[in-house]
Amino acid sequence: MRGYKIFSGSANVEFARQVSKYLSLPLSDAGVKRFSDGEISVQIDESVRGKDVFIIQSTCAPTNDNLMELLILTDALRRSSANSITAIIPYFGYARQDRKANPRVPITAKLVANLIQAAGIDRVATIDLHAGQIQGFFDIPVDNLYGSIVFNDYIKAKHFKNAIIGSPDIGGVARARSVAKHLGLDIVIVDKRREKANESEVMNIIGDVKDKEVILVDDIIDTAGTIVKAAEALKEKGAKSVMACCTHAVLSGKAYERIASGVLDELVVTDTIPLKEQLPNIKVLSVTPVFAEVIRRVYHNESVNSLFI
């Protein structure tokens, strides 16, 4: 039997440890060092010849370092005669640069897809890509899982009396509709106008939220400006409470300050990105069992279809 091995980059080592624990398979040894000038050096410390290899590495901040580390690890494993290499990328950086929104700008998500393939990766597994069409940037299989696989059960366990699912912007309506359909709830939409990057202005509430428990769903929470302003607008319209479920906790800039303000009653995120701080109103749900199951099924050539909801 060919066997498989799991390697971790330095972006989210605890995530990789939890995956390996679920599979009862110790993480394989690889040394990742940096030279004095910042260059990354990798040494694979055990044989991978003929093995199916899985690399766990989010490309979160520092995005460029973590991306390069993934590529260099892949090159080292490919040159060490691994049979196949699957990249488990819980958070896929640069996904927000998925189209030409303005003249003379790059489509960086496509460039990253090209780099990943050129390095020698055979398959990618991720969760809640900012734009689903990024799967089409690859000529290799890409499994894009959904955060709702953990959020839905958490929401059900809350036993809300008068809940409604909300989208913090027009672009997230499809995601909100999917969650609402699964839970049998109505949806509300917060229509906003973005004046410039990382700043947004809430404009209008589409739907009735009076005396309701609003659950906002989104893929990424970055500066938390959009979510917090949406929560403020919803409460001004009579919402009883506002909870947000966001898969990827980027949480840059003044995000922690905004969340700590208490406008959001609760922020629920996953562990695709390690948190820099712990706040009483932040709840972390783990998606490591989901990715562990992806690894097991891919290795055994089993369908992963049931992991998509």
Curated annotation (Swiss-Prot):
The record's section on Pfam families has:
Pribosyl_synth (PF14572), Pribosyltran_N (PF13793)
Known cofactor(s) = Mg(2+)
Q: What is its EC number?
A: 2.7.6.1
- Gene3D superfamilies per the record? 3.40.50.2020
Q: Which UniProt keywords apply?
A: ATP-binding, Cytoplasm, Kinase, Magnesium, Metal-binding, Nucleotide biosynthesis, Nucleotide-binding, Transferase
Can you name one GO molecular function term for this protein? ribose phosphate diphosphokinase activity
The question of whether NADP is a record keyword is answered with no
The top EC class, named as a word, is: transferase
Q: Where in the cell is it found?
A: Cytoplasm
Catalyses which reaction?
A: D-ribose 5-phosphate + ATP = 5-phospho-alpha-D-ribose 1-diphosphate + AMP + H(+)
| GO cellular component terms, semicolon-separated | cytoplasm; ribose phosphate diphosphokinase complex
User: Which residues take part in binding Mg(2+) 2?
Assistant: D169
What GO biological process terms are annotated to this protein in UniProt?
Answer: 5-phosphoribose 1-diphosphate biosynthetic process; purine nucleotide biosynthetic process; ribonucleoside monophosphate biosynthetic process
SUPFAM superfamilies cross-referenced by the UniProt entry? PRTase-like
Q: How is the cofactor bound?
A: Binds 2 Mg(2+) ions per subunit.
Which InterPro entries does the record associate with it? Answer: PRib_PP_synth_CS (IPR000842), Pribosyltran_N (IPR029099), PRibTrfase_dom (IPR000836), PRTase-like (IPR029057), Rib-P_diPkinase (IPR005946), Rib-P_diPkinase_bac (IPR037515)
Instruction: Kindly identify the residues recorded as the active site.
Output: K192
Residues recorded as binding ATP, renumbered to this chain, are: D37, G38, E39, R96, Q97
* Quaternary structure, from the entry: Homohexamer.
Q: What is this protein called?
A: Ribose-phosphate pyrophosphokinase
- List the lineage, top down: Bacteria, Pseudomonadati, Campylobacterota, Epsilonproteobacteria, Campylobacterales
